[in-house]
């Protein structure tokens, strides 16, 4: 591991390899490159001190460098212990940007690195958060509540919370008042994923959101592209790299049929698997059925499945009882943000054999084995390299626009959760059309007037679902 005073990466000598892949990724990320072209001279993020917690991949490296081109100072950590691409982290560290990310972190390292993205050399706080899953945001908010005397650290509900709470106590002892000062300095947060957005809406509902937030996840050019088309390519990539199993003809169960579930089901079906879907929402269940998938319960389907993948953002989706029913060598994995979709903790007293990084064989007392990918964490990033650059360009362009909006127009927003306006969503899509050779039809003035829009858009109402 290579560590300096202000970065921690696996091996800084990987920087040259990372830079070569960054150069390729830039050609596949037209939205971010257009943002550099449009905003580079005006420096809208000059003065922004961004704490970023998002998978430290090659694509994220392009995002980081875009934020810097726009004037921001950045400190970065990964939002998942397995998702870092070490050569990407090295490439960013080599430019002088503080990054704290290693593939295969311990939980203690993870929360130490999350703390480090708020530790600036001058001792002053961050003023923006760019988050994926909400861990960076929750670290500051829970810490501030603890400093205010609330009893929020005495009853951890999981191993991860034990480590998180210990890190908060450590920071409170080292820097009294740190969390309260940091919370007050934040102008806003932009949140990448469904899980983190749910956390923000819960805070808003309780009146506990202390700064504005932009829900990047529910931009159409994020959720309908990254969540669907990204998973469509990266899920099967992760299963293949992890297991080398042939999916054609196998029975695969996808738990959940939201945007991630839809992409995952299509991914497995495209590989030739016979896909079944579980759902709690009757609308999503009907969509799955009419897309040609059998809608089942996991109680009924567990015993016949060869592959089971969770996509829900909920907890305890695959229980220990489900796993007891599964056949020998069933592959179990998750593509939702957190590892609690699968009851991995309930497997810890069984026999574990590590096959290779992020692939474990779990043996039950009766001799039956399961193949668990990435210890129940995001398998597309743990076992593979995540979504392709092109689809991440759309997501990350939304992040850049959200950061600019909250940093430059802070007073225009209340302490609530917002989505980017429709015209910016359409702008992000427009920036990606040329790369695919797509040409837009242009409405005449008469046609536009007939449907009540302008020829330049926006073309749909805010509630249109796409």
Curated annotation (Swiss-Prot):
GO terms for molecular function: adenosylhomocysteinase activity. It is found in: Cytoplasm. Pfam families: AdoHcyase, AdoHcyase_NAD. The keyword Cytoplasm applies. The keyword NAD applies. Binds 1 NAD(+) per subunit. Belongs to the adenosylhomocysteinase family. This is Adenosylhomocysteinase.
């Amino acid at each position: 591991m290579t560590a300096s005073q202000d970065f921690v990466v696996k091996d800084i000598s990987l920087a040259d390899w990372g830079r070569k892949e960054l150069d390729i990724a830039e050609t596949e990320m037209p939205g971010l490159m257009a943002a550099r072209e449009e905003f580079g001279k005006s420096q809208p993020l000059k003065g922004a001190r961004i704490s970023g917690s998002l998978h430290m991949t090659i694509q994220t490296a392009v995002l980081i460098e875009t934020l810097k081109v726009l004037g921001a100072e950045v400190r970065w950590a990964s939002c998942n212990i397995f998702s870092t691409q070490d050569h990407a982290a090295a490439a960013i560290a080599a430019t002088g940007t503080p990054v704290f990310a290693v593939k295969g972190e311990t939980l203690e390292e993870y929360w130490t690195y999350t703390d480090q993205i708020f530790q600036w050399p001058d001792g002053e706080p961050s003023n923006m958060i760019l988050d994926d899953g909400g861990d960076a945001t929750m670290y500051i908010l829970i810490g501030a509540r603890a400093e205010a005397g609330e009893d929020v650290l005495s009853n951890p509900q999981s191993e991860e919370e034990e480590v998180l709470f210990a890190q908060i106590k450590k920071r409170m002892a080292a820097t009294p008042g740190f969390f309260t000062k940091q919370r007050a300095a934040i102008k806003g947060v932009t949140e990448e994923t469904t899980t983190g957005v749910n956390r923000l809406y819960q805070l808003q509902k309780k009146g506990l959101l202390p700064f504005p937030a932009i829900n990047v996840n529910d931009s159409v050019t994020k959720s309908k592209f990254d969540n669907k088309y990204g998973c469509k390519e990266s899920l099967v990539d992760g299963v293949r790299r992890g297991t080398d199993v042939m999916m054609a003809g196998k029975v695969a169960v996808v738990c959940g049929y939201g945007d991630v579930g839809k992409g995952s089901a299509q991914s497995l079906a495209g590989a030739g698997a016979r896909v079944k879907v579980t759902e709690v929402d009757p609308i999503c269940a009907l969509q799955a059925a009419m897309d040609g998938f059998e809608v089942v319960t996991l109680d009924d389907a567990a015993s016949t499945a060869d592959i089971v993948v969770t996509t829900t953002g909920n907890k305890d989706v695959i229980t220990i009882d489900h796993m007891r029913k599964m056949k020998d060598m069933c592959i179990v994995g998750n593509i939702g943000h957190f590892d609690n979709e699968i009851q991995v903790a309930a497997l810890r007293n069984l026999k574990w054999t590590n096959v290779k990084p992020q692939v474990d064989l779990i043996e039950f007392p009766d001799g039956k084995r399961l193949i668990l990918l990435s210890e129940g964490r995001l398998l597309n990033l743990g076992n593979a390299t995540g979504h392709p650059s092109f689809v991440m360009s759309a997501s990350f362009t939304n992040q850049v626009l959200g950061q600019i909006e909250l940093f430059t127009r802070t007073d225009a927003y209340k302490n609530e959760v917002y989505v980017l306006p429709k015209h910016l969503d359409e702008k992000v899509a427009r920036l990606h059309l040329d790369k695919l050779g797509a040409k837009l039809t242009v409405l005449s003035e008469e046609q536009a007037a007939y449907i009540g829009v302008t020829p330049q858009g926006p073309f749909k109402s805010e509630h249109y679902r796409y």
